[in-house]
A protein has these predicted regions:
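Conserved phosphate-donor/acceptor-positioning beta-strand/loop module used by diverse small-molecule
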Residues: 88-106, 144
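Switch/connector loops and helix/strand junctions flanking conserved nucleotide-binding motifs
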Residues: 70, 99-106, 132, 151-152
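Extreme N-terminal, non-catalytic leader segments
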Residues: 2-8, 50
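Single conserved hydrophobic/aromatic residue that forms the stacking wall/gate
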Residues: 160-169
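Conserved substrate/cofactor phosphate-moiety recognition/catalytic segment
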Residues: 16-59
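Short glycine-/polar-rich loops that comprise or flank the Walker A/P-loop
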Residues: 56-57, 86-91, 137-140
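Phosphate-binding beta-loop-alpha motif at adenosine-nucleotide cofactor sites
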Residues: 139-149
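Conserved nucleotide-sensing/catalytic segment adjacent to the nucleotide-binding pocket
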Residues: 49-80
Length: 169
């Protein structure tokens, strides 16, 4: 007996959050969990990755405010488009972190915050948190990373991206 091939939906996880909250760690963790991982993909290319004939079963895409065409409005528009794709189930994963921890992480790496414009990291972080607030409000999954180690973040990604709610604990 031959069974017809099931049309499986692509599971898409969009990962966003302020710089320093763990987006790259989350993307790498999702890759370790079997997702095709793409970090810093421009918003205008997301749909091309999701063509039914080319799509992987599980895809994780990191979205960075520093991206070439990133805008909050653009991402919110993309979410509307994705919700109409019958072959894709998507979730928006937002990584949150306290100002204190973000400042500490920046001082440890001695990197300039991308939105600081030569000013203090605090100013850049404040700008980014305000910019990302509408995205945070749309998140399906919110992970507070302030007290998480990279291993803990990977475990959280596993918990929240399991195939079914029953597997999520």
């Amino acid at each position: 007996m031959v069974l017809p091939k099931q049309n499986k939906k692509t599971k898409l996880i969009l990962v966003s959050g302020p710089a320093g909250a763990g987006r790259t760690t989350a993307i790498r963790s999702l890759e370790d969990l079997g997702f095709e991982a793409i970090d810093n993909l421009p918003l205008d290319l997301v749909q091309s990755v999701l063509k039914p004939e080319k799509t992987s079963e599980n895809i994780a895409i990191g979205l960075d405010t520093r991206g070439r065409d990133f805008s909050v409005e653009g991402l919110l528009d993309l979410l509307k488009v994705l919700s109409n794709l019958e072959h894709v189930d998507f979730e928006l994963l937002y990584l949150s972190c306290t100002m204190e921890v973000l400042l500490r992480r920046y001082s440890e790496t001695r990197r300039r915050h991308p939105l600081a414009n030569g000013n203090s990291p605090h100013e850049g972080i404040e700008k980014e948190l305000m910019l990302l607030e509408p995205i945070r409000n749309k998140a399906d999954i919110l992970i507070e990373t302030s007290d998480l180690t990279p291993h803990d973040l990977k475990a959280s990604c596993l918990l929240y991206t399991s195939p079914s709610p029953r597997d999520r604990g």
